[in-house]
């Protein structure tokens, strides 16, 4: 039987809206009664009826007919339920006018949670997912449990790719594996680090108290985990101030463990580019802001390295990315104006030098904002950082107003979508894009809670509802988060470790209408764009995981814990 209910499979916050949908086409298979005559009940795990409600045709400002999934949605709302408990949704007949008669239950959902604890648990799981992506170090059983593994891919003495025409060896130890593969990249690592540093910067007290580290649930705090990647970044800084592009195996690994991969082929440094150098400069300048209270020496190292990289980029503004994708991802970027904006804004937050003003004003003219961050388009870092700094109120005001415009556009798009999301095309990494849009709302919510009568917190949480289960394919897209989580991600560690369960806390890319993996034998549940997700290991187009998708989800969860 198809599941007729679309809801957040993990939970809802007590004081937040609690909206779910039913699909009329699926209900028709269960009853002859029209949807308007059906009722729903919210029932606690002890059997207490907490709420009884009816359905409204459509969803949000949408009429309810979802083009991308061929579903007709009706809305149920149990926001009145504030009691913290585990509960389920029952779809019932014969409630009205049948006093003393137990209603006929047509369908009952799996249990979910009303409470605050689930958000903290998901935050910890997301942060720990980066620990599981660590390269070059042992993952101890006391922290990693059944996913423990020996140190592999030390990368502490590796050569340079032949296309670099460079002799010698380099220490590139540490860092995170990027996604489902064993490459380590500065560009995609940069947007991930920058996003997590924003979370640290904005939620320092609350997040660090939740994620103190040293436990099974949380081996390292958010700042400590990010520092592991930053130390790798610092090793990728060349003597001249340029930053190497990536560490890559010679060829694509099969689905084996890091240990087996390490024995089977060499790993190499590949490329040095303006884009990687500016990603480094922006990330390290942000790191200086985050760590200066706790570790002034490390913050100083970061800022000095950022300055060196920025100077190299000024002298080398058009050094291309290495156009080699044999064994690792490309991350090609032919426009670095947005990275210059990011690097300058981060520098300005540390050192508001007079010489930066005209450059930042020009950056703001030529780098209009996007609805969310992306590894190729990083200008929102510039806008966000300027909105948060207090050195110049004029720049701050302009940045905030600009981001408010983005937030309003996101909410407008959500209101018009059947499922309440703001993307208009399901692409590779759609869950990352949705999470990044939610992050824009969460950041603007820090200084403005409503725009044109629409609450930013409400619409931010609606995006997360999609990620955690309220979607056409009925998956909670984070591994280990719910009964419906992916179990076969396109993730080499999860398939090479001999453990049945995948590494927890990983966000799958999600629905992708382009289906680039059809030749791999992937079977999708339907032909429509909204059904383009398959929990199958070959599905790199929909079921791969990546640190740049986990990072915005982590940041949003951190900001929700802050509030």
Q: Where are the predicted features?
A:
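Aromatic (Trp/Tyr) and acidic
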Residues: 5-99, 103, 110, 128-190, ...
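Short beta-strand edge segments in extracellular beta-sheet folds
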Residues: 112-117
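Extracellular C-terminal loop/segment signatures of secreted glycoproteins
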Residues: 122-127
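Short coil/linker segments at helix-helix boundaries
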Residues: 198-228, 266, 286-303
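Carboxylate/His-rich catalytic cores and anion/metal-binding grooves
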Residues: 220-242
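HEAT/HEAT-like alpha-solenoid repeats
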Residues: 234, 311-314, 361, 365, ...
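Hydrophobic, small-residue-rich alpha-helical packing segments that form membrane-like cores
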Residues: 307-311, 317-318
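Zinc-dependent metallopeptidase catalytic helix centered on the HExxH motif
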Residues: 371-375
